[in-house]
């Protein structure tokens, strides 16, 4: 049969409905090529439904739809039946079954799948951001970040950046070293975006010694020398005082605990 047409009606983009229709058509030899799919997205009023039903009646088309709002679903079904137009509700019956089986109430919000997709891509973007602007490798990230972490070596800057990225926050981190001037960008951003990571000298001394041992190196190296550590921490204090940013003590905290504190500070500061 020539000029076959299927109307895909949705209160969102309509991708889900169109994929189902195409999958169904693929079961018939040549049907996908011979059938025109017309997508009608963002249907929010009965006027559009009336128009689609009239078109489908005129050209013998089928209406396949994903309308989550019960009133809109009901109206389309009523109008299609009055006009003797074939229709298929792709998502409604399954939502009804789930409500009945699980004792839950659906949100009935159009576009939930797209919202989930957007949330996922925001997380991926934040993770990629954390990798790109890790360890101060590109100071330009400081100006783009939601949060800037600064601290001496082995204060969990990188794992914290990754953990916070999973909360959709773009985090740059900057190492503080006495011999290296901090990037000027640190002093031009809103101090509320900056978080200093403080740690006790003894705790840092222990962490660095263990790090050297794990690398098969001598734990007497200057990197783990207590006097050197104190020098680094004093310099760190000068920098955070100059910036005027908040400081979080990470001495006896797990990464998750510190990340939650930082996330709370960020949320509170909005």
From Swiss-Prot:
Question: Which EC class heads this enzyme's classification?
Answer: transferase
Molecular function, one GO term: ADP binding
Which reactions fall under this protein's catalytic activity?
Answer: N(tele)-phospho-L-histidyl/L-threonyl-[pyruvate, phosphate dikinase] + ADP = N(tele)-phospho-L-histidyl/O-phospho-L-threonyl-[pyruvate, phosphate dikinase] + AMP + H(+); N(tele)-phospho-L-histidyl/O-phospho-L-threonyl-[pyruvate, phosphate dikinase] + phosphate + H(+) = N(tele)-phospho-L-histidyl/L-threonyl-[pyruvate, phosphate dikinase] + diphosphate
Taxonomically, which superkingdom? Bacteria
Entry annotated with the keyword Ubl conjugation: no
Positions binding ADP in this chain are: 151-158
Q: Is-annotated flag, keyword Nucleotide-binding?
A: yes
Keywords, A to Z, come to: Kinase, Nucleotide-binding, Serine/threonine-protein kinase, Transferase
Query: Which InterPro entries did the record assign?
Result: Kinase-pyrophosphorylase (IPR005177), PPDK_reg (IPR026565)
Instruction: Report the EC code(s) recorded for this entry.
Output: 2.7.11.32, 2.7.4.27
Please report a single Pfam family linked to this protein: Kinase-PPPase
Family, similarity comment: Belongs to the pyruvate, phosphate/water dikinase regulatory protein family. PDRP subfamily.
Task: Report the protein's function.
Answer: Bifunctional serine/threonine kinase and phosphorylase involved in the regulation of the pyruvate, phosphate dikinase (PPDK) by catalyzing its phosphorylation/dephosphorylation.
**UniProt cross-references to HAMAP family, sorted A to Z:** PDRP
- What is the name attached to this protein's record? Putative pyruvate, phosphate dikinase regulatory protein
What is the organism of origin for this protein? Bacillus velezensis (strain DSM 23117 / BGSC 10A6 / LMG 26770 / FZB42)
Output the lineage of the source organism.
Bacteria, Bacillati, Bacillota, Bacilli, Bacillales
